[in-house]
Amino acid sequence: MVSVAGWSLPRPRRNGPPFHSKSNVITVLEQVAVLLELEGANVFRVRSYQNASRTLGSLEEDLWTVTQEGRLTDVKGIGKGIAGLITEAMTEGTWGDISSLYASVPPGLIQMLAIPGLGPKKIKLFHEELGIESIEELRVAAEDERLRNLERMGAKSEAKVLDGIALLERFSGRRRLDVGLLYGEALEASIAEMKGVERTQLAGSTRRRKETIGDLDIVAAVNPADVASVTEQILALPGIADVKGAGSSKVSIILGTEFFDSGIPSTGLDGGVLAALGGEAYEELATNTTIDAQIRMVPPHVFPFTLAYFTGSKEHNVRLRQRALDRGLRLNEFGLFPVDAVGELKGLEAAEFSLPATEEADIYRHLELDYVPPELREDTGEIEASTLPSLVEASALKGAFHNHTTASDGVASLEQMAQAAIDMGWEYLGIADHSQILQIASGLSPGELLEQSESVRALNESWADGKKDFRLFHGSECDILPDGTLDYTAAERACLDHVVGSVHQLPTWMKRDEDENTAALIHAVEQDDLTILGHPTGRILGGRDGFEVDMHAVLRRMGELNAEGELKVVEINASPYRLDLDWRFCKFAKEQGVPVAINPDAHSTQGLKDVWFGTQIARKGWLEATDILNCRSGADLERLLW
């Protein structure tokens, strides 16, 4: 896959055609237009891609249907050449010769596009006249006053470039789910208490529990007469770093850490989120970041439609709109209308003709669908499914298997971790300290591992004597070495109840290709005593991508081994820094007969509560309690692991 500064040609779907979604096609067309402009292409060629992307964005028909029927050139703004590109992408999964365009543009030029106020024309100018190819080089040039003498520049424009770079550094990038929830739940709770607000709900990718989010979307039910007052109350909130806009129905702000300084109405917070984010210490958490937020105020009778629309995803909404059209209805953020009834009326003017809805479930009922939980709204089969899964709840978890103590790099003792699990109502806790090769994390020597095994046995005996319904499982997070073998010898691992196999020697794995890494992981899961494949790709959200691996092939092999009577489990590492296994693979794991373990990878007692985040990812991946290993009882697990 060709990639430049985070821009890339998307991978084709495995179950195509169609091999790409409309969203993918639009993104590629938008990116190609920019790349062509940076290269100095003919302005009409650039505009053709810009127009095509805009046209597809407003196309209500199903793109795959239009493509199959050969009607792309009938769509205004799509010429023969671009129609051919779209057809190839949808039917074959490939993108013609535009991959060479991605490869030809220096990555730094793409990165500069994120600087506020800077577009392709100026970036091209800086590159051609001064050879600038990175944000840092641009900063130095501006500080040295070398930009002001260029065409269409000056001292003020130069200063704006520096201001833009400073803003980018402060506000750029996506946020992890936990950061989004930290701000989002608090902001929603604050708005819910404002006079004039009847209902409010966090929407967008945060509500859908995406692993990272771009900004916050909140929908509030407010009568028109109260909008001005509610707007004033929002703008009076503490910690607003900037106001991007405040109109008649929408307020756009940037929130900073100071938002938490005066305390948050915790009575309005989700209990699971509150516990996962730090419990009573929630208000004291330092996020060291900012986040954009949009608050949309709509009349109460419109609220369910606006909430559904801004929850998304775009792809899910497109499918809903098409389903509505198939039934003679029109669906948007203001309502669900019989097409014949509203004519040319739009927006709130048409809302009085809408079919009634007090909750989102009513919208789905009108469209002859079961209610789709927000986590599933990604156009991954939720519309077609005859029955949707009963998604796992965090309360169904009875323990976890991947946790650390002071024996390696944890900050709590074996006894403290066990007591924290007991306090959470769990039946068991699995310990998996690092293995000997990971000295940076104080990995245990074989002798230390055996000593820990004895400590676990002694604690279990004491609980059994005291009739306490709790036990520890003794495991190890054994490094998967580059050749796919496990740290420690088989004899040294024999004292363990379970083995969590994880990759930590990332430099080697990151350098290798997909085939080598896949073969090594498959070799690892084929080891008789490997129980759980831990954080399968090694990614750190916002820090590094995972190593290349064919996860489908790995999960397929694990399923084969399970069919032969073994127990091979894949982990959703619930740390909000990882959330790995990615939710996109969860349904496939289930189909292959591979159980999932939601593990917090806890290094402290508070870290145990990260399982809540892992549960959100499991839900997003269509998983039920029966798919989760640690929803089973301690007695069941004793039989499985021994």
What spans do the regions from the language model cover?
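Two-metal-ion RNase H-like nuclease active-site motif
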Residues: 200-202, 399-403, 477
